[in-house]
Swiss-Prot record:
Gene name of the record: cya
One Pfam entry name: Adenylate_cycl
This protein's name: Adenylate cyclase
Catalyzed chemical reaction(s): ATP = 3',5'-cyclic AMP + diphosphate
Sequence segments annotated as region (Regulatory): 546-865
EC number, UniProt record: 4.6.1.1
Keyword Cell wall biogenesis/degradation: no
Molecular function per GO: adenylate cyclase activity; ATP binding
Domain of life from the UniProt record: Bacteria
GO CC, alphabetical: cytoplasm
S-S bridge residues: none
Length: 865
């Protein structure tokens, strides 16, 4: 046994040394410096070293001895000798037990732009303050590396973390509550030991994995291994189907921003789930090769092993389309441009040699290599094809995931809040809605700019659909005829926004227009482009998990007036009588004409979605106002900016100012915190008619007011909306705390427990914020959540991309609770968040009423419109 263990240690050290050499090979001098000094900076703590803070900061790594280069560097900076080892150096009792890099570092997937993920494994006896100081030290080292242009992220890992199934929070690379064993799987197969103890897990044969602790204890009992010499993070025991689900959802979350990087991992998890529960994790395959002395896959390269496993899976299900895609993703990740001939005198690196062998096996020709190598020059047509292909692949993985959940009758182990955040990000990125600007270039190509863009208007009655067409060509007959347009939309605002936010339209683009009988000419178009580019940055930081879990709010809003229809055009060739003292742009002159002919809305919300809406006609101001205000729940933050762009031929400044004043006043009324005035209203005269905007608790309604009696009657009626609604014998109010959560466009359920804990009330707000109230309900809230989720997932499929049908925006569930005497709304967190296995099942609509909760149908629903 002793000789067997010694042989394994030698193999393990040899593989680790190979990975270290590969991590340094072909990398920049700065990368080599940072990567090589990380162990030194964590081992020592000195005012002259990066990462120093005052106080008792845990430092020192078990069994670490700096090499000559590291020692010289430290001695030079500190003017002191670091030749003497620390106390406890050989006992394994220093605070840091091991320093490991993980991920693509040292693999064929490492490139000059790769970041470095470092696990700093520490003793479990560090207290909270000590961990906080060590975390601060790591943060300062990250900042030092960042100043040198190297992206390093440290993760503090308690050596008992995985034994206790502890999890981080969503948003970090440790994936929130959605991963545990799978995170350890990735670490074990990609880890490179920079300093500290060896990993005990590698010494345990695969066949003993399910008896991990017993086998380890037997090795200790025999004296073959000494406990303090090894880092023991635990075995890769039995995985739950819930963890597969959570991890796969997390990979889809990451694929929104980095599709080429994440799609390979997504399909690996799909391959795992296909073999569940009898499959073998990739780390176990690697360990089996190590124990057998089989140094396969180009030196047990973690990235090549992942590709090989995914290839086996896709071939087994005859999915050659996705197989071709993951090979291209792999090729692009490696970043070795094989179509560029190397100098004969320059030796080819190991990564280039491996990739050359692979593309030969795949039978790729030079033309395909040239296209992939030229990705930095891809333009919109190729990028959009790539985006749709990646999207179809992700949706295929999502559908397979739902089938897996249904097959295994899942209740998800991820917290409801994490699942809500994950699905919201997918919804924001992928759900196709009218007016939403689809962003087609998530890190596919760095530059989609076009030198020439032509917007052509086709009026009604022609062979082609009426509306606007966009071409990436100059506007001459030869360039346009016979070529497909890049994009079409009925309204110019949407088309300009699409070209701008996708990076086609830049300050260097030549923009042309063929306006037909539209009011928008070349001058207006250039003004619109200038206004949008001045007020809307293309890139913003990704939305935070908190923003994704909250109702979406308008952040930046532009109100575009008279772009396509301009009533003031007729003032150029006729006499118009009006009173300068009564310049009302909404009811102008003797004819009381509304000078607002069209309004386009362009806004970005807190989920980073970009939306456009179009209104035309006399009522466009009223309709757009109601729409804007309806998208603001009462507790929403005011938009960071509200801009009015006006393109009227005449009275432009007056119209812009009046619209700005009106919108600002209405937003203030909508978001005012004074809820003692449920009857707040705004009267507005448009084209000789008086309208009332009524600011109610949950929405804003509009009513035409023909005379004084109707006017004051409407105001009085509106105030009555604030009074309680009676159900049965008891008065049931809509709790005021709900107001801050009411959000149009989504179904919301609020559960309120009564003094009798066996019964509860339900308040349901539909997508238009109409209210249904059910009182004295009995039964299982969890079952209701499950049934409602299943109902909406099967009957509200609005997401359409090719053959994909996914609805991410499921109903949201909350509970109204008392905390320290104050009423609060919290995410519903019952025994489970519904069974995700039911998502995607086809259920008849009446299923919800065939198994009602007791009391759920005992009271008539009251609707507020």
């Amino acid at each position: 046994m002793y000789l067997y263990i010694e042989t394994l240690k030698q193999r393990l050290d040899a593989i680790n040394q190979l990975r270290l050499e590969r991590a340094f090979a072909s990398m920049s001098d700065v990368f080599k410096q940072v990567y090589g000094l990380i162990p030194v900076l964590l081992h020592y703590h000195h005012p002259q070293l990066p990462g120093y803070i005052q106080g008792n900061v845990p430092h020192g790594t078990c069994f670490f001895e700096p090499d000559d280069v590291q020692r010289q560097w430290v001695n030079k900076l500190t003017n002191a000798s670091c030749d003497e080892p620390m106390n406890g150096y050989t006992s394994g009792e220093l605070p840091i037990t091991g320093i490991y890099s993980m991920g693509s570092t040292s693999s064929i997937g490492q490139s000059h732009c790769s970041d470095i993920d470092i696990w700093v494994c520490h003793q479990s006896w560090l207290d909270q303050d000590e961990r906080a100081r060590l975390q601060r030290k790591c943060l300062l080292i990250e900042q030092w590396a960042g100043e040198l242009g190297i992206d390093v992220t440290f993760f503090l890992i308690d050596e008992n973390r995985f034994r206790h199934h502890a999890s981080g929070s969503l948003g970090g690379e440790d994936c929130g509550s959605t991963q545990h064993i799978l995170l350890l799987d990735e670490f074990y197969r990609t880890a490179v030991r920079l300093a500290g103890k060896r990993l005990l897990w590698t010494m345990v044969p695969v066949e003993e994995e399910y008896h991990y602790d017993e086998y380890v204890n037997s090795l200790y009992a025999q004296g073959v291994l000494t406990p303090n010499e090894w880092l023991d993070l635990g075995g890769l025991g039995e995985l739950s189907a819930e963890e597969y689900f959570g991890a796969s959802l997390w990979q889809l979350y990451k694929s929104v921003d980095s599709p080429y990087k994440a799609v390979l991992k997504s399909i690996l998890l799909e391959a795992y789930s296909a073999d569940y529960p009898n499959g073998k994790l990739l780390a176990l395959e690697m360990k089996q090769h190590l124990h057998r002395g089989e140094i396969v896959n180009y030196g047990l390269d973690a990235y090549c092993m992942m590709l090989e496993r995914v290839t086996r899976y896709l071939v087994s299900i005859n999915d050659l389309t996705r197989l071709d895609l993951i090979r291209r993703c792999f090729y692009l990740k490696v970043c070795e441009k094989l179509s560029n001939e190397k100098n004969e005198n320059e030796p080819a690196g190991w990564r280039r040699q491996v990739l050359s062998q692979l593309v030969t096996q795949w039978q790729w020709d030079h033309e395909r290599l040239a296209i992939l190598d030229n990705r930095d020059s891809w333009k919109i047509e190729r990028v959009r094809n790539a985006h749709n292909e990646l999207l179809d692949t992700m949706m295929q993985s999502y559908r397979n995931l739902i089938r897996f959940a249904r097959r295994n009758n899942l209740s998800v182990s991820a917290s409801p809040q994490d699942i809500g955040v994950l699905t919201r990000k997918l919804y924001a990125a992928f759900e196709a809605l009218p007016g939403k600007v689809t962003l087609v270039n998530p890190q596919i190509s760095p530059d989609l700019s076009e030198p020439h863009l032509t917007f052509i208007y086709v009026p009604p009655g022609r062979a082609n659909r009426s509306g606007w067409y966009l071409y990436n060509r100059a506007p001459d007959f030869a360039h346009i005829v016979g070529h497909q347009p890049l994009e079409y939309n009925r309204y110019l605002n949407k088309l300009v926004a699409w070209s701008y936010f996708n990076g086609l339209l830049t300050k260097d683009s030549q923009v042309y227009i063929h306006q037909g009988d539209s009011s928008c000419d070349e001058i207006k178009l250039h003004e619109l482009v200038r206004d949008i580019s001045s007020h809307f940055p293309i890139r913003l930081p990704a939305p935070t998990p908190k923003a994704l879990y909250s109702p979406c709010e308008i952040r930046h809003l532009a109100i575009i007036v008279n772009l396509e229809v301009d009533p003031t055009e007729r003032f150029s060739d006729q006499v118009v009588h009006f009173d300068f003292r009564k310049l009302d742009v909404f009811s102008f002159g003797e004819e009381e004409q509304c000078l607002i002919g069209s309004i386009d809305l362009l806004y970005r919300n807190s989920w980073n979605e970009v939306r456009t809406l179009h209104f035309n006609g006399t009522q466009s101001m009223l309709e757009s106002l109601k729409t804007i205000l309806g998208k603001m729940h009462q507790d929403a933050a005011p938009p960071a900016s509200v801009e009015v762009f006006c393109y009227s031929q005449h009275l432009r400044g007056l119209i812009r100012t009046r619209v700005q004043q009106l919108v600002s006043e209405c937003i203030e009324l909508r978001l005012s915190t004074n809820r003692l005035e449920p009857g707040r209203f705004k009267a507005l005269r448009i084209a000789g008619q008086t309208w009332g905007l009524f600011f109610e608790r949950l929405n804003v309604s509009v009513q035409k007011l023909e005379n004084a009696i109707e006017f004051y009657g409407a105001i009085s009626y509106n105030k009555l909306h604030g009074l309680p609604v009676k159900l049965g014998k008891d008065a049931r109010y809509l709790p005021a705390v709900i107001d801050g959560f009411a959000c149009e466009g989504i179904i919301q359920f609020f559960f309120e427990t009564t003094e009798d804990n066996n019964v509860f009330n339900i308040y349901i707000l539909d997508e238009a914020n109409r209210v249904e109230i059910y009182s004295h309900c009995e039964g299982s809230k969890e079952e209701l959540v499950k049934d409602v989720s299943r109902f909406y997932s099967s009957s509200h499929d609005r997401f359409t991309y090719g053959s994909s049908f996914i609805n991410f925006n499921l109903p949201q569930f909350y509970q109204i609770v008392k905390v320290d005497g104050a009423t609060q709304v919290l995410p519903f967190a019952g025994g489970s968040f519904g069974k995700l296995s039911d998502l995607g099942k086809t259920a008849p609509k009446e299923e919800m009423s065939t198994k009602p909760i007791q009391g759920f149908n005992d009271y008539q629903a009251v609707h507020h419109h």
